[in-house]
From Swiss-Prot:
Family: Belongs to the universal ribosomal protein uL29 family.
Superkingdom to which the source organism belongs: Bacteria
Name of the molecule in the record: Large ribosomal subunit protein uL29
One CC-aspect GO term: cytosolic large ribosomal subunit
UniProt record, GO biological process: translation
Gene: rpmC
HAMAP family recorded: Ribosomal_uL29 (MF_00374)
Matches recorded under CDD domains: Ribosomal_L29_HIP
Keywords linked to the UniProt accession: Ribonucleoprotein, Ribosomal protein
GO molecular function, one term: structural constituent of ribosome
Length: 76
């Protein structure tokens, strides 16, 4: 996950899995920020990657709310 999670992979997840990924990413971002503040962070690039992953997850959730993308496994 050095380059983050591609949006097409996130679109294949259901709503519950997306929420789980979002929670995990937010926790990781919190820990990375804490490490940066204490001078223990060795990979500064990871901060940016995690922020972008969070934004991608929010984008996929919003696309589904607006009906721009379909929820996998949901038959119309």
């Amino acid at each position: 996950m050095a380059n983050g999670t591609p949006a097409h992979e996130l679109r294949e997840l259901n709503a519950e899995e997306l929420k789980t990924r979002l929670t995990e990413a937010k926790e990781e971002l919190f820990n990375l920020r804490f490490q940066a503040a204490t001078g223990q962070l060795t990979n500064n690039r990871r901060l940016r990657t995690v922020k972008r992953d969070i934004a991608r997850i929010y984008t996929v959730i919003r696309e589904r709310e607006l009906g721009l993308s379909e929820v996998p496994g949901a038959e119309a």
